[in-house]
Amino acid sequence: EICWGGMHSWRNMIQTLEAVDRPNIGFQADMSHTLLYTMGYNCPEDRILPVDYKWDDREVLKASLKELTAALRPWTIDFHVAQNDGTVHGTGSHDKTGRHCQATDPNGKLNIAEDAGFWLRDADGQLTKAFKHICWDGCMFSNAVMEQQKTWNDILAAMIQVRNAH
């Protein structure tokens, strides 16, 4: 969670992991939360995306995700596929956390299958197969949404797209 102390920015997360210095402790990457790292939530000085970033410019987003994942991928042991609309929960200066969206949310900012590749592949585009767990994260919805077969079909479709791409 990017709202937790020591995890509130990607740079702080790396500093925390380096300070702990344990080979069996790593980072759990969640596509929704880590998108917010690029936006500088909870730590504006560590923002990667430009302040005036326009969401239709995928090249700028991809460059920011490359920078982020290059820094955190070596520490990552678990990977959570997710969608985010670029908004957060929380009102304080360090308690903002990711707002997961449904897989097919039209306001979602991520190209799930493509952007998962920044985590699943190294800088040369080679699969790392380094993660112990890969799952969907983003089921914080009402019962009415969770009880719809479409919700689960969309999640499964997104996960299959990630598998097929990587």
Give the role of each language-model region.
Residues 1-6:
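Conserved strand-turn element in the central/C-terminal portion of the radical SAM core barrel
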